[in-house]
């Protein structure tokens, strides 16, 4: 859908109906569309005003200073319909280490990256950043225990942000219309219509 900029399928309207229903029932805070990092996380999650936050595994790290004792839990977004992707499908790839192609010490840099992402240093990096470890056999932070089950069950991987950030126009269209949907400015139908423009 994103790759081809084709939002004409029935799943767009179905998606809109789900979020329109949540907005009508009051499940979404009124200022959700204008929540900008880090204010929304600190004001709403860390203070306990919101019970749930649509985000990623990096959130516990981002607000650990404001909510060090938070009891974290994660779940995979369920399939919207039997024909769509379900909890087996997730996106990966938010951070990485890189070596400049012009580096005179590329081999040393690579060995350092290996050193930092294996064994005790991988576990320490994961523990202190409350992040996903690199190695499959490293211990995960307790805050991400549920996320580990999700990642371990993933059989289909999407590109980062499902590819929406590859196109500024598509990115803007999704962000603008989704923001309007979750605060009730768009109905499911007007959301679906706007996504085809």
What are these regions (language model features)?
Residues 25-28, 65-129, 176:
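Extracytoplasmic/periplasmic substrate-recognition and gating elements
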Residues 42-44, 60-66:
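Pocket-flanking alpha-helical
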Residues 46-55, 70:
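Alpha-to-beta junction loops
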Residues 1-14, 65-66, 79-88, 139-145:
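Short, solvent-exposed loop/beta-turn-alpha elements that line the ligand-binding surface or hinge
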Residues 31-46:
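Short helix-initiation/N-cap motifs at beta->coil->alpha
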Residues 38, 55-60, 77, 93-95:
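Beta->alpha turn/N-cap motifs
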Residues 68, 126-180:
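Long, aromatic- and glycine/proline-rich binding clefts that accommodate carbohydrate-like moieties
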Residues 2-33:
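Glycine-centered hinge/linker elements that transmit conformational signals in sensory
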């Amino acid at each position: 859908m994103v790759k081809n900029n084709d939002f004409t399928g029935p799943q767009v309207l179905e998606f809109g109906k789900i979020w329109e229903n949540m907005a009508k029932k009051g499940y979404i805070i009124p200022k959700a569309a204008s929540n900008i990092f880090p204010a929304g996380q600190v004001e709403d999650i860390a203070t306990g005003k919101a019970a749930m936050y649509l985000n990623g595994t990096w959130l516990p790290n981002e607000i650990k200073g404001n909510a060090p004792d938070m009891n974290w839990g994660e779940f995979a977004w369920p399939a919207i319909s039997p024909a769509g992707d379900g909890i087996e499908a997730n996106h990966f790839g938010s951070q990485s280490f890189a070596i400049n192609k012009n580096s005179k010490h590329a081999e040393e840099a690579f060995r350092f990256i290996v050193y930092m992402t294996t064994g005790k240093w991988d576990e320490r990096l994961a523990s202190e950043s409350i992040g996903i470890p690199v190695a499959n056999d490293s211990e995960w932070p307790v805050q991400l225990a549920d996320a580990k089950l999700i990642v371990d069950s993933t059989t289909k991987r999407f590109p980062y942000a499902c590819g929406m950030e590859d196109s500024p126009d598509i990115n803007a269209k999704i962000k603008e219309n989704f923001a309007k949907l979750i605060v009730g400015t768009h109905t499911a139908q007007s959301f679906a219509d706007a996504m085809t423009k």
